[in-house]
Amino acid sequence: MIPVILGPNDCHYIIDHHHLARALHEEGVKEVLVTIVANLRMVDCDTFWTVLDNRRWMHPFDDKGHRRKYKDIPKSVSGLVDDPFRSLAGELRRLGGFAKDTTPFSEFLWADFLRLRIKRKLVEHDFDRALATAMEFSKSQEAIYLPGWCGPASQD
């Protein structure tokens, strides 16, 4: 199920599983099961976005890690742009680079960490090498603050 917030004008706002929603959309799936996390239909648009942001129900950053204005957030899943560092972080987690965590948008936090350490060109042109580099960084003391970090606790 895809978690959503009910917002102004009875719109459903996806707050997680965006990649799944995008993939289903591209496959032509017309209906999906959702779970309603909160009903904010009664608030005005400005308050709605502020609540989503403060509750960490949104990640208003683009594929380069720059914060977007609320008005620039895609209006549908078809407008979502792939962040190659989010893809790298997802694969890193799948391979054991870090543990699944309940922290909202934890893979985006890892993506931002990796974005500062690995060249985008490497991620886009040699994903396997970028992944190996990401695995090394994921086990480092530099990453200790990130959710799901499972690197060595000591420097042996």
Question: Where is each model-derived feature located?
Answer:
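Short hydrophobic beta-strand that contains or immediately precedes a catalytic carboxylate
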Residues: 13-16
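Surface-exposed, charge/polar-rich loops and edge strands
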Residues: 1-6, 10-11, 25-156
